Amino acid sequence: VGKFPLLANSR
């Protein structure tokens, strides 16, 4: 993760 911190946190 890093490019998509928001997406990873959304799960």
Swiss-Prot record:
Looking at the UniProt entry, the stretches that span the membrane are none
Q: How is the cofactor bound?
A: Binds 1 FAD per subunit.
Which reaction equation describes what this protein catalyses?
N(6)-[(R)-dihydrolipoyl]-L-lysyl-[protein] + NAD(+) = N(6)-[(R)-lipoyl]-L-lysyl-[protein] + NADH + H(+)
Keyword Oxidoreductase assigned to the entry: answer is yes
Q: Which cofactor does it need?
A: FAD
**Keywords assigned by UniProt, alphabetized:** FAD, Flavoprotein, NAD, Oxidoreductase, Redox-active center
Q: What is its EC number?
A: 1.8.1.4
Q: Which GO terms describe its molecular function?
A: dihydrolipoyl dehydrogenase (NADH) activity
Q: What does this protein do?
A: Lipoamide dehydrogenase is a component of the glycine cleavage system as well as of the alpha-ketoacid dehydrogenase complexes. The pyruvate dehydrogenase complex contains multiple copies of three enzymatic components: pyruvate dehydrogenase (E1), dihydrolipoamide acetyltransferase (E2) and lipoamide dehydrogenase (E3).
The annotated subunit structure for this chain is: Homodimer.
UniProt similarity note: Belongs to the class-I pyridine nucleotide-disulfide oxidoreductase family.
Q: What else is known?
A: The active site is a redox-active disulfide bond.
Protein name, UniProt field:
Dihydrolipoyl dehydrogenase
Biological source species: Populus euphratica (Euphrates poplar)
